[in-house]
Amino acid sequence: RLLRGRLESLIPAAYGKLARLAADFRSRVQHAVPEARRRAFWEDALQGAVAEDVLAGREAEGRARLEALLEAAGHAPDDAPGEVYLVGGGPGDPELLTFRALRLMQQADVVVYDRLISDGVLALVRRDAERIYVGKARAEHTLPQEEINALLVRLARAGRRVLRLKGGDPFIFGRGGEEIDTLMAEGIPFQVVPGITAASGCAAYAGIPLTHRDHAQSVTFVTGHPKRDGDLRLNWPALAMPNQTLVFYMGVHGIQAIRAGLLDHGMPPDTPVAIVERGTQPDMRTHVSTLAEVCALVERTEISPPALLIIGGVVTLRGRLDWRGQAAQRQAG
């Protein structure tokens, strides 16, 4: 009784009118809309302007809108493509997802996801959506990027709503631009939803502001993933300049080259360095060292990917700004 009362207080009574309207159209939709597109039709109808009209008491307008949607669906070609949602899944904590990301995750027919997607984020995808894992660990891609691009096109051409779920933000070292370039060339509809990039999420959870008036007037995001020959080919003189913060994505594997490049171009050996491991997730760890000693830290510490390097004076602020560590101490005390 308590649960029923709670639900009745949360669900507007007008939803009954919306349900009756859907029932009136059910058999017509079954005849006019192919089965592969039927769920998408109802979701578009019942989450958009039709629902808004009915819930606002404009039942006649809602019925007219649904008639128009059904008419358009009946004239759509059978081979019309579906749509691809390129969604940033953030750094790992599912509570950092955007509202739009969560909505599209619940609408998708199939999800294509990478290694960097946490279990907590993946659990929020529609339960009956097909799941396709494409890997993309360092040097161990379950599918090469070109095959991932082709997979997205193939799934969308089958009329499916494809969730391309990527860790962090798809446009920051996520190769999202390459994927939508292919979709554009193939005439596949798509939309892009940004996510919180690892630099922002990891730094915030570690208590390290990326900029600070006393320490850094700029921040630079850098890929730490070396080329096949082991060379990073970066602008080391610019990166070694003072009063800035450097964030290296995928930097642990190339830590020796990063250390050498910065030291060789004048960065002080005592420059603070933080390695944030599995940032924003329950098993997150933060290791603090200096540029001179960071390689030794990596050698003696088993660091699990994903891990992020933060280099600069802002790292010294962690001692007093580690809000999560302080909260844990208060709870323990």
Predicted regions and their residues:
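Short, solvent-exposed amphipathic alpha-helical segments in soluble enzyme
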Residues: 4-7, 99-107, 125-130, 178-182, ...
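Short hydrophobic/aromatic-enriched beta-strand-loop microsegments
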Residues: 129-136, 187-191, 210-220, 266-275
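Adenine nucleotide-associated cytosolic modules
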Residues: 1-9, 24-27, 31, 94, ...
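Short alpha-helices
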Residues: 1-20, 197-201, 207, 306-307
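Class I S-adenosyl-L-methionine
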Residues: 72-73, 80-88, 106-196, 201, ...
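Short, glycine-rich nucleotide/cofactor-binding loops
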Residues: 86-96, 139, 226-227
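Class I SAM-dependent methyltransferase SAM-binding "motif I" and its flanking Rossmann-like core
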Residues: 169-242, 282-289
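A contiguous loop/helix-start segment that scaffolds small-molecule binding in enzyme catalytic cores
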Residues: 20-78, 82-84, 158-162, 216-218, ...
